[in-house]
Amino acid sequence: MILILLGPPGIGKGTQASVLSYILKINHISTGDIFRKNFKENTELGTLSKKFIAQGLLVPDDITNQMIADYLSKDIATKDFLLDGFPRNVLQARFLDDFFKKSHLFLTKVIYFNAGTKDLMKRIAGRRICPECGKVYHIEKIPPKNPGICDKDQKTLIQREDDKPETFLKRLKVFNKETLPLVQYYCEQNQLFEVDGMQTIDQVTKMILEVLETDRK
């Protein structure tokens, strides 16, 4: 089983990815984790990426594509995983299609989490993240056991710069321009399932599991 999760920033893809990977017993492959791994190991691709990020620029598709392909090639033995954060545009999606074809892999479903801007702004305002392990919390919906402290490593939680209102709106604009066309791309391939991302975590999970079960029959 191979799943792709799509949705605007702040919709909760990472949370849902963790839940689904646990229930379905498949690997959760996060683009953010792959980048952090390359940064930590000082790989050539990681070093190149840092140069663009330091200038406030998007990492070029060819670098991101190669980074993802390298990771998947090493971890391909399971052939069961979900992708969170990739592809981000149609060119990356076409690259991924070619990679799957060459690797004899088959995409099961693309899950698109939809929500309005006002709802997303409200949700993003309460989001907090651990600077050490990257675990995401929400002060109302997914609070830590101790306010402001990560359950895993006891680090003080922070609000990412990306989650501050002015930065978030810029990210949303980029999403609408670059990533939203993927909805049409995968819809035309009859691989898209759209879900209301503002429902509870359990409700969203239930809907996704039901559509996956239907596809298996």
From Swiss-Prot:
UniProt-annotated binding residues for Zn(2+):
130, 133, 150, 153
Q: Which InterPro entries match?
A: Adenyl_kin_sub (IPR006259), Adenylat/UMP-CMP_kin (IPR000850), Adenylat_kinase_CS (IPR033690), Adenylate_kinase_lid-dom (IPR007862), P-loop_NTPase (IPR027417)
Q: What class of enzyme is it?
A: transferase
Which keywords annotate this record?
Answer: ATP-binding, Cytoplasm, Kinase, Metal-binding, Nucleotide biosynthesis, Nucleotide-binding, Transferase, Zinc
The record's GO molecular-function terms, alphabetically, read: adenylate kinase activity; ATP binding; zinc ion binding
Q: Where does AMP bind?
A: 31, 36, 57-59, 85-88, 92, 160, 171
Q: Which Pfam families match?
A: ADK, ADK_lid
Q: Name one GO cellular component term.
A: cytoplasm
Key word Nucleotide-binding present in the record?
yes
Query: Is Cytoplasm set as a keyword in this record?
Result: yes
* Region annotation NMP: where it falls in the sequence: 30-59
Q: What is the role of this chain?
A: Catalyzes the reversible transfer of the terminal phosphate group between ATP and AMP. Plays an important role in cellular energy homeostasis and in adenine nucleotide metabolism.
This chain belongs to the protein called Adenylate kinase
Question: What species was this sequence derived from?
Answer: Aster yellows witches'-broom phytoplasma (strain AYWB)
Gene label: adk
